[in-house]
Amino acid sequence: MQVMQPARLPHHYREMSSAEKEARIREAKAFFGNDLLIPGHHYQREDVIQFADFTGDSLQLAQLCGQTSSANIVFCGVHFMAETADMLTSREQHVILPDLAAGCSMADMASIAQTERAWEALTERFGDTILPLTYVNSTAEIKAFCGRHGGACVTSSNAKNMVQWAFAQKPRVMFLPDQHLGRNTAFALGIPLEKMAVWNPHTHELELLPGANIEEIIVILWKGHCSVHEKFTVEQIKNVRDRSPHTQVIVHPECTHEVVQAADKAGSTHYIIETLKQAEPGTSWAIGTEMNLVNRLAKQHPDKQVFSLHSTMCLCLTMNRIDLDHLAWSLDLLREGKRQFEITVAEDVAAEARTALARMLATV
C-alpha cells in the first residue's frame, strides 16, 4: 500500500476551540456537498462521529464505500478500513484517512511474509486441503493473499456464513489474523476445540491442544488478537453477576473463547447495537466491547442500565487517533486541493484483494 507522508499537525489546530474546529468541518461539508462522504465506524469518538454521514460496522462500511459516487471519502476509522474503501471505489475517487497513524495492532500481527511462510509449511503438511479466510481487520496484502488462493474476507457479522462457505470449498480452513473470532465462530458451528490448532508465526509451529491428533485438525487459527477485546475476562463477568444477578452480559466475538462462553450473548457490533435497541426498558446490560460504543449506547438508551464489562477499559487507541484536530486539518487541506492523507492500494494487490472481498459480499 502507498500512502503520502503527512507533515506534523500544525500547532494552531491544538489551540483552536472545539467550536472553531467543528465550524471548519461543517464548512467543508457544505463546500463539497455530495462530493464528500464521511463514513464513521462505531468505535469512533463522540465528537467525531457527529460528522459521519453514515455510521456502521466493518461490513456495513465496506458495502457503503462500494456503492457511493462521492469523489472524496474521508474515512473516520482505521488504516485497513480506508484500504478497503480504496479498493472498492474507482480510481477517480479518493480515500482520505485523517491520521495515517490510525492503524490496527491486530492487522499488524499477520504480515504477508509470515503468511506466505505459514502457507508453504501448512500446505506441505496438509496438501491442497486448506482455504484461507481473513478477517477484514487485516492489510490489503493479506486480503490479496486470500483472494489469490481461493479464499475470502469475513467480518464479525458474517463469520459463520463465511466459514460454512469455506468448508464447502475445502476440508480445512485457515483463519487469520484473529484467533478468537475464528475459534468462537468454528465452535458455534459445532467444531470441537480439539480439531482446532493455532499457527504461531514466531515459532513457525502449529500449537495443538493436549491429546489432539494433527490429522484431525480442520481449523487453523492465526496467533493474533484484538488488544482491546482480549482484556475482558471471565472474572469480570463473575464480578458483574455477583453484584447484579439480573444484568445480562453481551460481548464481541473478538473476546476469548472463555469469555464468550461465559457471556449471555455474543455478536458483532451491529448485533450488540440491535440487541440493545430491542431490549426491554429497565433491563441491565454489561457490554464487552470498545468503550466509545458502550458510552454511546448508554446515552442512546437512558431507559436501560448500560455499562462496560471492564470498568477501567481503555479506548481503542488507534481508532481514537481520529480526532477533531485531524479531521478539520484533513478537510482544510482537501479544500485547498491537497490530498495529503490519501490511501492508495497498488492495483496488483487491490485486484486480488477485491476478489476476496467480492466473494464475501456475494455470500452475505
Swiss-Prot record:
GO cellular component, one term: cytosol
GO MF annotation terms: 4 iron, 4 sulfur cluster binding; metal ion binding; quinolinate synthetase A activity
Pfam families per UniProt: NadA (PF02445)
One biological process term in Gene Ontology: 'de novo' NAD biosynthetic process from L-aspartate
Catalytic activity: iminosuccinate + dihydroxyacetone phosphate = quinolinate + phosphate + 2 H2O + H(+)
Cofactor (UniProt): [4Fe-4S] cluster
The keyword Heme appears for this protein: no
Binding site for iminosuccinate: H41, S58, Y135, V136, N137, S156, H252, P253, E254, T269
InterPro entries given in the database record: NadA (IPR003473), NadA_sf (IPR036094), Quinolinate_synth_A_type3 (IPR023515)
EC supergroup of this enzyme: transferase
PANTHER family named in the record: QUINOLINATE SYNTHASE, CHLOROPLASTIC, QUINOLINATE SYNTHETASE A
Protein name according to UniProt: Quinolinate synthase
Organism: Shouchella clausii (strain KSM-K16) (Alkalihalobacillus clausii)
Lineage: Bacteria, Bacillati, Bacillota, Bacilli, Bacillales
